[in-house]
């Protein structure tokens, strides 16, 4: 059970630090509008699945952001190594967060039902 708390704490710390690194250290214009929404850690802390969102809904912008994040992974890991006191910095896997789009779709459906009444 204590290991679960550790993975949650490490995930929260990585989320905070990656957001800061993206804002201050990464100069790639493809990742300027990226916000980290969640980080899920594997139990042994070897891999961190980093969920992100961007303001644009264009598929080309999504692909550019994904490519920019993949290119910046080395810089992000290096900065995490400087800021975190972990034995091994986890491998970062970036995935677009679909939950916000899903929530917006549900919200639109509820509004449409509300307008019918």
Swiss-Prot record:
Locations listed in the record? Cytoplasm
Keyword Transmembrane listed? The answer is no
Q: Which PROSITE patterns match?
A: RBFA (PS01319)
Q: Tell me which UniProt keywords the record has, alphabetically.
A: Cytoplasm, Ribosome biogenesis
User: Alphabetically, which GO biological process terms does the record hold?
Assistant: maturation of SSU-rRNA
Gene Ontology CC: cytosol
- Entry GO MF terms: ribosomal small subunit binding
* NCBIfam families per the UniProt record, alphabetical: rbfA
Question: HAMAP family annotated for this entry?
Answer: RbfA
What is said about its interaction partners and assembly? Monomer. Binds 30S ribosomal subunits, but not 50S ribosomal subunits or 70S ribosomes.
What is the purpose of this protein?
A: One of several proteins that assist in the late maturation steps of the functional core of the 30S ribosomal subunit. Associates with free 30S ribosomal subunits (but not with 30S subunits that are part of 70S ribosomes or polysomes). Required for efficient processing of 16S rRNA. May interact with the 5'-terminal helix region of 16S rRNA.
- What family does this chain come from, according to its entry? Belongs to the RbfA family.
Its recorded name reads Ribosome-binding factor A
| The encoding gene | rbfA
